[in-house]
């Protein structure tokens, strides 16, 4: 087995005159052979000289192979590896954008919390108002007559969509019902509780019919 061999790194004190790289996996060479092509290849407006890395040399060779009339250049490579001085100038801008995004996210979260609180407050007010209305209806129904026209009364209906000009409020043994003009019945479960009178009447009927059966049999015998 062959062991892993770390590639040798070559360094330049001043760095590459094009990209400003101070270390490379290939050797640095003198830039005199390529200085005449720097202006068109890299879009430079000033003359540069010194050491050049192998990566920039390959870019010059690629530029020479371009077809005639081509305006392509590698200007984005110029000073691309200038070192930490260039990075420090870019970091504050990134931090500003991050802080701005954090401020926006905080504002959105605050708005969401306020919206949830508003909904919870509205729900609590409606829930607290509904139980307070039910005793009012029961007291009014007990004090009032058994049947009354809802159109003439000042009470508000149990249902907001209930038409008081059509439905008539009635008090029965099991509670309060609303009866229409054609006999239809509307029941509110909060005001209507089935009583046991119907069950008692149903159980009494078979007992009353039981003693009558022998009388019929005696008449047949006579």
Curated annotation (Swiss-Prot):
Recorded GO CC terms: Sin3-type complex
Biased composition (Low complexity): 124-135
Tree of life domain: Eukaryota
Localization annotation: Nucleus
Pfam family name, one: FAM60A
Keywords: Nucleus
Regions of compositional bias (Basic and acidic residues) in chain numbering: 111-121
Keyword Nucleus: yes
InterPro entries, sorted: FAM60A (IPR026065)
Compositionally biased tracts (Polar residues): 136-154, 210-222
GO biological process: negative regulation of cell differentiation; negative regulation of cell migration; positive regulation of cell population proliferation
Record's keyword annotation contains Nucleus: yes
Region (Disordered): 111-154, 199-222
Cysteine disulfide links: none
Biological role stated in the UniProt entry: Subunit of the Sin3 deacetylase complex (Sin3/HDAC), this subunit is important for the repression of genes encoding components of the TGF-beta signaling pathway. Core component of a SIN3A complex (composed of at least SINHCAF, SIN3A, HDAC1, SAP30, RBBP4, OGT and TET1) present in embryonic stem (ES) cells and is essential to maintain the complex on chromatin.
Stated family: Belongs to the SINHCAF family.
Subunit-structure text: Component of the Sin3/HDAC corepressor complex at least composed of BRMS1, BRMS1L, ING2, SAP30, SAP30L, HDAC1. Found in a complex composed of at least SINHCAF, SIN3A, HDAC1, SAP30, RBBP4, OGT and TET1.
PANTHER family hit by this protein: SIN3-HDAC COMPLEX-ASSOCIATED FACTOR (PTHR13422:SF12)
Protein name (record): SIN3-HDAC complex-associated factor
Species this chain originates from: Gallus gallus (Chicken)
């Amino acid at each position: 087995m062959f062991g892993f061999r770390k590639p040798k790194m070559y360094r330049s004190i001043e760095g590459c005159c094009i990209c400003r790289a101070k270390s490379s996996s290939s050797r640095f060479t003198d830039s005199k052979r390529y200085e005449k092509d720097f202006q068109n290849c890299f879009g430079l407006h000033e003359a540069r000289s010194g050491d050049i890395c192998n990566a920039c040399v390959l870019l010059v060779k690629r530029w020479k192979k371009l077809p005639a009339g081509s305006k392509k250049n590698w200007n984005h490579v110029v000073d691309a590896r200038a070192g930490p001085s260039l990075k420090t100038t870019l970091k504050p801008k990134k931090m500003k954008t991050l802080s701005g995004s954090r401020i926006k996210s905080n504002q959105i979260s605050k708005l969401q919390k306020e919206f949830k609180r508003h909904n919870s407050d509205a729900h609590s007010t409606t829930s607290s108002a509904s139980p307070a209305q039910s005793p009012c209806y029961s007291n009014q129904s007990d004090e009032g007559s058994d049947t009354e026209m809802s159109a003439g009364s000042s009470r508000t209906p149990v249902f907001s969509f209930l038409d008081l000009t059509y439905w008539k409020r009635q008090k029965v043994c099991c509670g309060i019902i609303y009866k229409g003009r054609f006999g239809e019945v509307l029941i509110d479960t909060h005001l209507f509780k089935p009583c046991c009178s119907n069950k008692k009447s149903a159980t009494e009927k078979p007992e009353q019919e039981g003693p009558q059966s022998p009388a019929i049999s005696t008449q047949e015998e006579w």
